[in-house]
């Protein structure tokens, strides 16, 4: 039976780092798939963008088409191995927030778990300011909190259309990265035996 875990969090929350470390410790051997990378590959193929950070500026209807193409690719992969999707539940665009997974897309992927990584707005802002490699929009702490609140609401919506369980993992500076990694490993190890 396919086992798919979606891991989400707004930019700067530490999602990719936690994911990478948890995959090393988990007993279940997941294939890590970055949903944005799959969408980006489709967008480049169509001549729509040259750089990944241009994706969020695309027309929302075009983004939805790219989402569906990426979802179908994930379903094929999940037939043979457990999949961990590194993604964003919502994407801030110039005209508003876009759901990372409209109803049709989440129904195609049908994840078992939706994991949300969170931190305080001040921690996220600090991490973003230290990460000079990415072209990120500047947001206030209030906007960052609003984005995290929207992610929670989106996760509930996704769970309604997929029966996924929701797990919230906090990645605070004082809590330690190790605890957040441990919590994700516990979720991933539920896939042990699903592909035997």
Curated annotation (Swiss-Prot):
| Residues annotated for ATP binding in this entry | 9-17
Q: Which InterPro entries match?
A: Adenylate_kinase_AdkA, P-loop_NTPase
**Protein name, per record:** Adenylate kinase
Its keywords, alphabetically, are: ATP-binding, Cytoplasm, Kinase, Nucleotide-binding, Transferase
Q: Which GO terms describe its molecular function?
A: adenylate kinase activity; ATP binding
Which reaction is recorded as catalysed by this protein?
AMP + ATP = 2 ADP
Q: Give one Pfam hit by family name.
A: AAA_17
Q: What Gene3D superfamilies does the database record attribute to this sequence?
A: P-loop containing nucleotide triphosphate hydrolases
From what organism does this protein derive? Thermococcus onnurineus (strain NA1)
Q: Where in the cell is it found?
A: Cytoplasm
Q: Which HAMAP family match?
A: Adenylate_kinase_AdkA (MF_00234)
Q: What is its EC number?
A: 2.7.4.3
Q: Which GO terms describe its cellular component?
A: cytoplasm
Q: What class of enzyme is it?
A: transferase
The UniProt family comment states: Belongs to the archaeal adenylate kinase family.
Chief place where the protein resides = cytoplasm
